[in-house]
Amino acid sequence: ILDQGPLFETGGSTSHAPGGVFQTNPSRMMCKFAQYTVDLLRSLSFEEKPCFHTVGGIEVSKTKERHEDLYRKLGIAHSYGLTDAKIISPDEVLKMSPFIDPEKIHGGYYVPTDGLAAPVRAVRAMAKYVTDLNAGEFIGETPVTGFKISNNQIRGVETPHGDYEADIVLVSTGIWAPKMGRLANISLPLVPCEHQMAWLEPFEELKEFQADHKEAQVEHALMRHQDYSLYFR
């Protein structure tokens, strides 16, 4: 496995991804993928630390229309295997997220098994599993600069540090996938999009949070507010 950055905090999204996992999705396949991801990450640990924190996920409704939509999502969740999903009252939301004003919401859609992944820790755990089995090698600081192709068949990849022979190449480069595609004369229809991230001052409601204790930041449920395209962790 080749990576253009240092292992395992590569400088890409793995090292600074929020890590929130909301499993409900109108696509059955995506919903099942999310459930599999949660099950996998919950089974992993690295240096005796978990790779997933099952803190639950809540989507709040500020309008009657949004609240009705939460019931639609509840039906989807139950039909796709998230049988523990439920609609909760504003006061129940407040118990899980102390910075919420219960007077301003109709309620929430709650999935207890949603949670927060520790992306770098999870990658380290999976890499250790592979290397312990001598099933693979991880090489950092090695960007792919080209593909060796003969008779429309992949033969290997080129890097600044030498070539690697391979009859199958799996491209898992995220936003850099179109660049990789161009190296192989293949069009990959993927467009990276920016979005905003805000760092907030401490909340009085969260004053017991200790900034020097990283695990403390995952004590409260993940929060999503779809009317404003926001989520909080």
Which sequence ranges carry the predicted segments?
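A short, glycine/Asx- and small/polar-enriched loop/turn
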Residues: 65, 99-105, 148-155
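Short, flexible, mixed-charge acidic loops at enzyme active sites
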Residues: 11-18, 99-101
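General beta-strand structural signal in soluble alpha/beta enzymes
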Residues: 86-89, 138-140, 171
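Short beta-to-alpha linker loops that shape the active-site pocket of alpha/beta-hydrolase fold enzymes
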Residues: 5-7, 93, 126
